[in-house]
């Protein structure tokens, strides 16, 4: 967790908001990639559901954060 937080340390206001959005998009992209890899190999219904739920939710959140970034910082 410390590595993810380093990009936020010492920041406030717009700098914090921008760093948070950028880091969270990277974090969510990683989660989506992991879930996609899981779905290629697991046969467990619980993990299939979890993987699909992660892909759906975090893909939507990635788009939301990218839209906010564009609206607020471009």
Where would I find each of the regions flagged by the language model?
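His/Met- and acidic-residue-enriched segments that coordinate or traffic transition-metal cofactors
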Residues: 1-74
């Amino acid at each position: 967790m410390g590595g993810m937080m380093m990009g936020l340390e010492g920041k406030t206001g717009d700098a914090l908001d921008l760093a948070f959005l950028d880091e969270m998009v990277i974090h969510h992209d990683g989660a989506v990639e992991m879930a996609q890899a899981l779905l290629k190999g697991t046969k467990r219904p619980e993990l299939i559901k979890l993987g699909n739920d992660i892909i759906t939710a975090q893909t939507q959140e990635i788009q939301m954060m990218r839209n906010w970034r564009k609206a607020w910082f471009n």
